[in-house]
Amino acid sequence: MRKNILFLSLLLLLSLGSGSCKRISNKNESKEVILASFTVLADIIRNVAKDDFIVRSITKPGVEVHGYQPTPSDLVNASSAFVFIDNGFGFELWAEKFVSNLKVKRITVAEDLDPIFISEDFYKGKPNPHAWISPKRGMLYVDILVDSLSELRPSKR
């Protein structure tokens, strides 16, 4: 008797768990994926895109973005994305080659921003690629993302 109750309880738990997973994945299957080059940019995009898109980052928290080497699974994930969004200003040195192998739309957020040049150290005279750190420029990132995504998907404006 005890074995029967244990078996039925286990069966009930397994069936409840598998049913809830299926509902979650079905809800997201119809949403397009936006792939960001790094986590901070993905966070900004999530705040712009709200629930209209699934937003993912190629790199994970704590990973060095500047010299990142995309993996084969990154290419597979990117090939099914609606759009790839990167920062620009040389922040992701790997992005140009990465995107050249894909047939995916690309938005480079800092592309139309005037650079702020680094004034000292080894990088003196080069554009500072961390433009989102400035609150003013962070707001420009949001404006650029709203305009770019609205242009690509006017129905999601």
Where are these regions (language model features)?
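Hydrophobic alpha-helical segments with strong N-terminal bias
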Residues: 6-7, 118
